[in-house]
């Protein structure tokens, strides 16, 4: 099920990006003491006391020629639309400002849970200054310091109290859930309609007609599926409507609910940098992946065109070397019937479980074929391996020193596992662990 979403909202230069980086544990956002320095939305996963969530740094959205308060209003409205909980960030050094009050008015009308944070309270003497923030109407203000990491535990405790209860989606466990992700107008909704044989999803030539994820139950040859069609992911800076600002987040939430992710490309336009970024989301999710090249009917081709396009995909998406590629046309429905069997295959691979004795035979054969690497005179020793998870298949390899497992040798082991067991369309995770 989708993780809860926290949005950090506030006027520029209250420290949203610093707090975001503290929560996710790494420096993802650019942080400078200049209002509006965070130029785009930053998304990341966080965890607090066994609560997993997604978090958005909304700092400095579309900083440009628009009036200052309009920027704030757009930022808050977008966060309201997507978030389950909003952290309203203010600056204790500045006190309550007119801009804070503008944000508060919008959030107060939202009926979304709001946790009020007063940042830059860097020492105990400043705590008495936070009481003015009660006037914003959101109850107790939580004093925090992004610079020193103070008060974040209490803040996240309060935010977690407002996370929605996890509910099952009502579909059978055997139902295969697959999502379609890609740039606007690559034909995702047309592909859904081609599979269903009806105009289930509104389709037009306007990029981004599908505004949100739409679930569609679907049955074929006695098997049940749920198709999750997502709003297109736009290249940053091109679109300013608030309904588009979190299309990436919507797609990420759809991916979380999926067993299989279809990365849809436009065969007519070819591959652009945004496609690579979108494909990266699919790979990072650990879901099974199929690359779909749509609009193949519109491509001028000969007997070498498909092979050349496939080689281009492999060059751009080296991290998805395991993903099968399907060429089709949603418009003419040519080859669309080949897609479902591929989805079945990668979903099955995603769930493969290997017996420990069989797994170790393959690992030891691999070591005999290609001896383990050495570093500073020490050789990697692999004692045994075991599979600890599926979706994706995850293996723990017990070794003398995890630092000796070089990524190139890890890749070699993954390739041997693929050759032995298939694993079509699914990533493989290998975790090196020292033997006690």
UniProtKB/Swiss-Prot annotation:
Domain EngA-type G: 4-167, 176-351
GO biological process, one term: ribosome biogenesis
One Gene Ontology MF term: GTP binding
Binding site for GTP 2: 182-189, 229-233, 294-297
KH-like domain ranges (all copies): 352-436
Residues that hold GTP 1 according to the record: 10-17, 57-61, 119-122
Keywords carried by this UniProt record: GTP-binding, Nucleotide-binding, Repeat, Ribosome biogenesis
Alphabetized InterPro entries for the sequence: G_ENGA, GTP-bd, GTPase_Der, KH_dom-like, KH_dom-like_a/b, P-loop_NTPase, Small_GTP-bd
A Pfam family matched in the record: KH_dom-like
Disulfide bonds: none
Family classification: Belongs to the TRAFAC class TrmE-Era-EngA-EngB-Septin-like GTPase superfamily. EngA (Der) GTPase family.
PANTHER family: GTPASE DER
Function: GTPase that plays an essential role in the late steps of ribosome biogenesis.
Subunit comment: Associates with the 50S ribosomal subunit.
Designated name of the protein: GTPase Der
